[in-house]
Each structure stands twice: as structure tokens, then as C-alpha cells.
A protein has these predicted regions:
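A substrate-engagement module of RecA-like helicase motors
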Residues: 54-203, 285, 289-350, 357-369, ...
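Pre-Walker A adenine-sensing motif
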Residues: 1-13, 32, 512-520
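Conserved strand-helix element at the start of the C-terminal RecA-like helicase core
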Residues: 47-62, 627, 634-669
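Signature of the SF2 helicase/ATPase Hel1-core->accessory helical subdomain module
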Residues: 33-40, 63-64, 182-203, 207-444, ...
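Walker A/P-loop
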Residues: 12-34
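Conserved SF1/SF2 helicase motif Ia
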Residues: 16, 35-60, 233-235, 645
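Pre-Walker A (Motif I) flank of P-loop NTPase domains
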Residues: 10-19, 45-49, 201-203, 526-527, ...
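Conserved motor-coupling elements within RecA-like helicase/translocase cores
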Residues: 188-203, 676-725, 737-740
């Protein structure tokens, strides 16, 4: 594995390399060895290293320290390596101890500030409650913790950070700020609370995918996005559990997009006004030496001043064409329900209007000094009269502004670089873009919306000259790319309110980013190595679109040669050589048509069968057959575990978690069944069984996972027989469930890497469901779920697994569902049999089985039970 990674890094300046490495194959160990062996070699001396994974708790930062230490390089580890966490997480963990240690050094005006006091009070309250939890109130306590943490993350920490940034502004450059934090007593505590200030001093970084996408806030320079920043140029980036990071990126893209509710007309006006009226600083339009060289070599290119002038002309033309000096207002009689009207735009516009109206037109009323918005049944005769024409023009101008801002910013950065004095800090593209946008005095929300879009368009950065032409070809390829990955989508909606009664607000949510686009940014600047058991599994729902990435990266999409493939195959064969010593049993668990017939397979006592038939009939209605089937299959797996004296640990994975008194999957009822099964098993002579279902059943849920998992491992290490109930989402990718081998337990060593921990003895797998967002005809979905559904729908249309007609029909249904149009949805168009959905289910099953394949020590018997629906159709 190390040889394959080294060959990729030495043969490419940038690109993407996917490594399919099975769970338990030592992939993390090999990555850490690679970093520790190569960081100080001549060929890697200019490279930074990144290790990225979904779960922050799975970052092997302390393990890397051991790899450095065994080579005598512990000092280098402290000097060069850092784990970058969210600022709020660090503050929650450190603020109290740092305040105690540095209380005499922290300036009094900081300690006495409202921002510091509010933050300290919240952190103290949170930590006190966590240290002294109230027994039996775990669920309400968890909700309280989450509320306080979100308040710190969203309000208290940003306010305190703003205070510190203002404090450090007395030092004019990032370098001087960093020097003060490192050396001046009254500022050293800042480095303890915000270790990210030292990012530029390090070379090896460990961070979650969330942090990588959302960006780095260092206090000493503008916040930047890792994937567009020069920090990753020529870097080696390892992405652990590669395919699963797509869902994490998608989640953050959706969350960020839904946070920016953009008033399209207002944003246009706020950009147009300074373009028309303001005299911009001369430095903004002074061409840099690099720009002048480009102008000499390209006859059609324009100066910065000409670009700014063209931008003003384009905005003014649109402003005049649509009489934008007047407000836009919905004519009340044209629609009864304005809250249920949307315009969706991907490759083209699609209207989702209430009632029988299919079009929306704009009528200019010069007498009333008003632009009237009217819903109509007929398409307007003049194209310019359509609202779609207005919105298209406005969005095109905003995109033009993004492009021109990026061009001006890059020129300004080059100008600053050319004028830089000795020992002066670099002026970054982030500095330049922020400076350009600041000239337009935009609202904070507009700036936060535009900044990453402008930076994303400027992420090419400084590259080696001999690769510039090749990269330009890639950029040209992207400019013709019309896929959802590159262009994204957006949707518009309309709001009328008494507080803005003279005009209607036309808002949009914009999703121009995609996980594939982020990955392309990375692979254009760095050497990206994606590692997972299912890294190259072909599913656009559970993995990146590999066909698209290959098409866009071309030669930079690296595939290992035959020698490396054979070497990895031999390594894998060595890992599984001892499996022949095991007895592996697989079985599908079925369901019979009525409760009584199923219960006869579970119990032998006719009175118990009758009693529990009645309980099931009371718990499950005829309409809820799926829940009953799911429940009874779990009970059948439970019985098989109880009656097998060779099994001590069992993992039962379902689509949802069992909860007490939850009719569809009642934990209390499961424990009742367990108690009765234990009674009959003991009567049948089975030994070493728990007293009751309460002792046998262990529910592992997301809330309080770490504490529960530690308790579970301790009990299993003592030899207790435990049936663990959990869900696919809870266990997830990368969760470690192995536990220390109990005393006097006979285990089988399957390879030379076995240590002191063993895997579970058995597993039950329910057929994965809800892999696509569920559009329930009886319940509205959230805004974020609807956007996720649209992304999934667009991904499938992109690959040709769903027709445009069916896909757009589903998207329209999703909008109706969001706005409360329930009871109309038809599932006939949902692509249940498409390859991506099929492979997504396979991926979930492979990752689930991987939870019991992490170590070299196994029970002599391994039992794998599956929902019979998996046998029939995989999903």
C-alpha cells in the first residue's frame, strides 16, 4: 500500500488516486507510516500532509505521535503536526483551564467584556451539567447540552472571536500578530484557546471533513476554505472512508445553502448602485505586471478598468430593460396562495405554482410606478414580460459580478505582491476578494454568500508554469460542463408581508456547489488519495460520481499498475489466511403471513404464543405490516443468538433505533420477548445466560454513544452475553466495536496482526431502506431534506438512471410536499431498481459487516443473519 501511494505521489503533481482497502487491512497504519517515513525526505520537503475523515473522534492523531516517536522524531511531531478542531469545540474543552492558568496575564478589559463573561458562563454551565448528569433524564439532558453547545457555536464564540480579532488589529500583518501570540505574555493564552493561529507554522494536519469544507478561522488572517486555498497546493491529502465523505460534504453544502436566503432583486440593486455612482480606488483598476503581460499576449483581453466598466454597463442595461427603478409587487387577485409558489432552476426553469396557473409575468405600470407580478394560465407574448426572463438576467449579472470580482481580486493580489517590501507578509487571495467585496458595502449575509463563490472561481492559484496550459485546458473543459456537479441548481419563492406591503420579496436559495466540485478543486491543486473498502463502488448516491471525475481529471485520475494490484492482493490473502479455521454460518431470516405462525418459531408454550399474538396485534396495525415484519425478524435473530452457547456477542443492525414505548419498534417489548426466550432456553438446558431481557439487550444509540460504547466493551470483556441493538446511521463508517478478549475464552488467530481485541461473534442485517429521502404523502419534509432529495434526483438524472421527465416530476412533488400539498404524491417514478440505489445498499451492508471484521482474533464460530429481502433483491 505504501509503495502504491509513493508511486502515485512521485508520478503526479496533482490528481486523484482511489485505494480499495478492506476493513481491518491496516490502511490507517500504513498511511501514518507513510507520513512518518516521508515528511522529511527531499522529495516531500515542500509538501504538506492532510488526513481527513468523517468522524473527528476517529482521527489517529495520537497514533501518529507514536510513529514519530519510535523513529526518534517526537520533537518534529510537536513542531509540525496539529489537529484542527472547530473553534467552539476547543473553547468548550479548554476555556476554564486556560482562564485559571492565565488569569493574571489576560488583559482586564478582555476579562470584563460582556463577550468573555457570556462565553465563560455558558461553558461553565455546560461542563458542570455534563459532570453531574441527572440519572433517568439522559434524553432531556442531551437536548439541553445541544442547545448550549449550539448557542456557544452560533453566538457566544463568534462574538468573542470578533473581540479578539479587534484586539490583534493593532498588529498590522498576520506575521506580527502570530509573533505577539507566541512571545508576548498578555497574548499567549490566545494560542491555547485558538491553536488554529499556528496553522501556517505546521505541515501535517488532521481534521474532519466538516472542518475541511467549512474552513479555517485563524484570527490573524481572513477565514479561508481549505479546498480553494494555497495551503493545499502540492499537498498530499489522505481521505479516509473516501466514499462516505460525499454524504458529509453534501450535508454541509445543503446546510450552508439553506442559511443564505438571498433577495435577488435587492442584491442586484446593492451591486448596481456603487457601480453607477461610486468612484473606486485607483489600485482596484491598476493593472499588475502579470495582467499587462497577459494583455500583450491576448489581443481580446481587457484591462481591469475596462472590465469594471463593462460590468457597470451590463448591470445598467438589465436595470433599464426591466424598469428596476420601480418595486416589484404581486397583484393580489392573480393568486390566492403566494406561499406555495416556486420557480426551480437547474438547466432551465420549472414552475411549481398553486392552482391552475403555469406562468408568471411582469407588467410595468409607469403611472403607479410599480412592476406588477401576475400569475397567468397563458405564456406571455413578449419574452421580456416573463418573470423568468427577469430572474435569468438578474442571476446572470450576479454571476458576472462574481467573475469580475475574482478577476479584480487576483489582479490586486498580484499588484500587492509586486509592491511588497522585504519581510512583509503575503497578501492572500482571501484578503483580495474580501477587499473587493468590501468596496460594494454589501450586507453581511450577501458577503458570506458571495465570498466562497468568488474564491471557488479563483482556486487555480499559483501553479508551476509547465502545468499551466494543461490546467487551463481543464478549466476550459469545466466552462462547457453543464452537469449539476458544476452548475448546481437554485429555487425562487415569493414573500408578501405587511412590513413590506409596497413590494414583494423574491428570494432564492442557491446551491452552486457539489461534493464532486469540491473534490475537483482538491485534485487540481494536490495529490488526493481516497481510501475505503468501497472507494471505487459505482453509486452516485453513496459515492462520488467516478465517471464524472474521470472525465474531468483525465490523466490526473490515477489508476495503479498491475504490479501494485498484485502486491495488494497478496497482502489481502495474508489477512484472511486464517479464516479457513473458522466456521462461518449465514442464514436468511424469513417472515410468515400471520403473527401466530411466526411466534410458533420463537416459543413452544401455546399460552405464551397466544399472549404475545395479542400483544403484537395491539402494537401493530394492519396498515403497519412493514414494522411488524421488521420487529419479528429481530426477535427471530435474538432467539438464534440466545440458543447458541458458542456466541457471546451479537450486533443487530436496523434502519431505525428501538425506543421504549415506540409502537413501531418498542424496546420495552423487545426486552419482554427476550425474557420469555431466556426462560424457555434455560428450561431447554442452555447455560451461561443472563437473568432477564434487561441484562441481555443493550441499545447503542447516537446520544451518549462514547459512554455507552465504553460500558458495552467493558461488559463484553468480562464475558457477558449481550445482544446489541443499533442502527446503520448510529454505527456508521469507522466506528470501532472490537473489545478485549475475555479470560478463558477460546479465540482463533486469523493473521499475524492479531493483538488483544476481538470482533463480535455475529450480526443481523436488516435490508437498508430510505436511501433516498422519503417523500411521505402524509407528512411535510424539511427544507434541508427537500434539497437533499433534489440533489439525489439530479445525481440520478446526470447518470441516466432516471429520466428527465420522471426526475422533474419528482422534484415538483417534493416542492408541493414542502409547502403542505399532502396526500397527492405517487411513488411510481421513484427509481427503486436503479444501479446506484442497488449499489448504495450493497455499500451499507459491506460497511456494516466491516464492523465485525476489524481484528485478527475471532470467535471459532461467526454467524451472519440477513433479512430475507436482502437475499431476494439486496434492497
Amino acid at each position: 500500500m505504501k509503495e502504491a501511494m509513493d508511486k502515485f505521489c512521485k508520478s503526479r503533481d496533482n490528481g486523484l488516486f482511489l485505494l480499495d482497502m478492506t476493513t481491518g487491512s491496516g490502511k490507517t497504519f500504513n498511511v501514518l507510516e507513510f507520513i512518518a517515513e516521508n515528511y522529511n525526505k527531499e522529495e516531500y520537503k515542500d509538501s504538506k500532509f492532510f488526513f481527513i475523515t468523517n468522524l473527528k473522534k476517529n482521527l489517529p492523531f495520537d497514533e501518529l505521535r507514536k510513529h514519530f516517536s519510535k523513529r526518534g522524531n517526537a520533537g518534529d511531531f510537536d513542531k509540525l503536526c496539529m489537529q484542527i478542531d472547530a473553534n467552539a469545540d476547543v473553547l468548550i474543552h479548554r476555556l476554564q483551564s486556560v482562564y485559571t492558568a492565565y488569569q493574571e496575564d489576560i488583559p482586564k478589559h478582555i476579562i470584563q467584556s460582556p463577550e468573555f463573561k457570556a462565553l465563560l458562563n455558558s461553558v461553565q454551565l455546560l461542563n458542570k451539567q455534563k459532570r453531574n448528569p441527572i440519572e433517568g433524564k439522559e434524553e432531556s439532558a442531551s437536548a439541553f447540552y445541544k442547545y448550549i453547545e449550539n448557542d456557544i457555536r452560533d453566538k457566544k464564540e463568534p462574538a468573542f472571536r470578533k473581540l479578539l480579532i479587534a484586539e490583534l488589529n493593532s498588529f498590522k500583518t498576520p506575521g506580527k500578530k502570530l509573533k505577539a501570540i507566541a512571545n508576548e505574555k498578555k497574548y499567549q493564552w490566545i494560542g491555547e484557546l485558538y491553536p488554529a493561529v499556528f496553522t501556517r507554522e505546521k505541515r501535517i494536519y488532521f481534521l474532519s471533513m466538516d472542518k475541511f469544507f467549512l474552513g479555517n478561522t485563524t484570527l490573524i488572517e481572513p477565514q479561508y476554505l481549505f479546498y480553494t486555498h494555497k495551503i493545499i497546493e502540492n499537498a498530499v491529502i489522505f481521505i479516509d472512508e473516501f466514499d462516505s465523505t460525499k454524504s458529509r460534504l453534501l450535508q454541509q453544502i445543503i446546510k450552508v445553502g439553506c442559511e443564505h436566503k438571498i433577495n435577488s432583486i435587492d442584491l442586484f440593486t446593492k451591486i448596481h448602485s456603487p457601480l453607477k455612482l461610486k468612484e473606486f480606488p485607483l489600485d482596484l483598476t491598476t493593472d499588475s505586471h502579470s495582467t499587462r503581460q497577459y494583455l500583450e499576449q491576448n489581443s481580446g483581453a481587457k484591462t481591469c478598468a475596462a472590465n469594471l466598466e463593462d460590468l457597470e454597463k451590463a448591470f445598467s442595461k438589465t436595470h433599464d430593460n426591466f424598469s428596476m427603478q420601480y418595486s416589484f409587487r404581486t397583484r393580489e387577485e392573480s393568486t390566492k396562495d403566494k406561499s406555495r409558489n416556486f420557480l426551480f432552476q437547474d438547466l432551465q426553469f420549472h414552475s411549481i405554482f398553486s392552482g391552475d396557473k403555469s406562468f408568471m409575468q411582469v407588467k410595468v405600470d409607469h403611472k403607479a410606478k410599480q412592476n406588477w407580478l401576475e400569475f397567468t394560465q397563458e405564456k406571455p407574448e413578449k419574452e421580456d414580460a416573463e418573470l423568468i426572463s427577469l430572474l435569468s438576467a438578474v442571476k446572470a449579472r450576479i454571476s458576472y459580478f462574481q467573475y469580475t470580482s475574482g478577476t479584480l481580486a487576483r489582479n490586486y493580489m498580484q499588484l500587492k505582491e509586486e509592491r511588497k517590501k522585504e519581510r512583509e507578509d503575503d497578501f492572500t487571495i482571501e484578503n483580495a476578494v474580501a477587499s473587493v467585496l468590501n468596496e460594494f458595502h454589501l450586507d453581511k449575509d450577501y458577503t458570506q454568500y458571495l465570498l466562497p463563490l468568488v474564491l471557488s472561481g479563483q482556486s487555480l492559484g499559483k501553479r508551476k508554469k509547465d502545468h499551466q496550459n494543461n490546467l487551463q485546458e481543464k478549466e476550459n473543459l469545466r466552462s462547457f460542463e453543464r452537469s449539476v456537479y458544476e452548475r448546481g441548481f437554485r429555487y425562487y419563492f415569493f414573500e408578501d408581508d405587511l412590513n413590506h406591503n409596497l413590494n414583494s420579496q423574491i428570494y432564492f436559495y442557491d446551491f452552486q456547489n457539489s461534493p464532486e466540485k469540491v473534490l475537483l478543486h482538491m485534485a487540481k491543486k494536490a495529490k488526493v488519495i481516497g481510501i475505503s473498502a468501497t472507494a471505487s463502488l459505482d453509486t452516485v448516491l453513496g459515492n462520488y460520481d467516478l465517471e464524472y471525475l474521470q472525465r474531468m481529471l483525465q490523466a490526473e485520475y490515477y489508476e495503479m499498475d498491475e504490479a501494485d494490484q498484485k502486491r495488494l492482493e497478496r497482502h489481502f490473502e495474508g489477512l484472511i489466511e486464517g479464516y479457513q479455521k473458522l466456521k462461518i454460518h449465514t442464514e436468511a431470516i424469513s417472515y410468515k403471513e400471520n403473527f401466530m405462525d411466526n411466534l410458533k418459531e420463537i416459543f413452544s408454550n401455546p399460552h405464551i404464543i397466544q399472549e404475545y399474538t395479542e400483544k403484537l396485534e395491539n402494537s401493530f396495525s394492519k396498515e403497519n405490516k412493514y414494522a411488524a415484519v421488521s420487529f419479528l425478524r429481530v426477535i427471530k435473530a435474538l432467539k438464534k443468538f440466545v440458543y447458541n452457547e458458542n456466541l457471546r456477542s451479537f450486533l443487530c443492525l436496523n434502519n431505525k433505533l428501538a425506543q421504549e414505548d415506540k409502537a413501531s419498534f418498542d424496546l420495552k417489548l423487545i426486552k419482554e420477548f427476550a425474557t420469555e426466550i431466556l426462560k424457555e432456553a434455560k428450561m431447554a438446558g442452555k447455560k451461561l445466560l443472563p437473568k432477564a431481557g434487561e441484562d441481555l439487550i443493550f441499545c447503542l444509540r447516537t446520544e451518549g454513544y462514547e459512554q455507552s460504547n465504553a460500558e458495552l466493551k467493558e461488559r463484553l470483556s468480562k464475558g457477558e452475553k449481550i445482544f446489541v441493538l443499533s442502527s446503520y446511521n448510529t454505527i456508521g463508517v469507522g466506528q470501532n466495536l472490537q473489545y478485549k478478549v475475555p479470560e478463558n475464552l477460546e479465540v482463533v488467530k486469523i493473521n499475524q496482526y492479531a493483538q488483544e481485541e476481538k470482533d463480535f461473534d455475529g450480526i443481523y442485517l436488516e435490508a437498508p431502506t430510505h436511501l433516498i429521502v422519503n417523500l411521505d404523502m402524509n407528512n411535510s419534509i424539511s427544507e434541508e431534506d427537500m434539497v437533499k432529495f433534489i440533489f439525489q434526483d439530479e445525481f440520478l438524472m446526470e447518470r441516466g438512471e432516471l429520466s428527465r421527465i420522471d426526475g422533474l416530476a419528482l422534484i415538483k412533488e417534493a416542492f408541493r410536499n414542502l409547502s403542505g400539498g399532502l396526500g397527492r404524491f405517487s411513488k411510481k417514478n421513484i427509481p427503486h431498481d436503479c444501479p446506484s440505489l442497488h449499489n448504495y445498499a450493497i455499500k451499507n451492508l459491506l460497511q456494516a459487516v466491516g464492523r465485525i471484521c476489524r481484528t485478527g482474533l475471532k470467535n471459532k464460530e461467526i454467524h451472519v443473519y440477513v433479512d430475507e429481502d436482502i437475499s431476494e433483491n439486496t434492497i
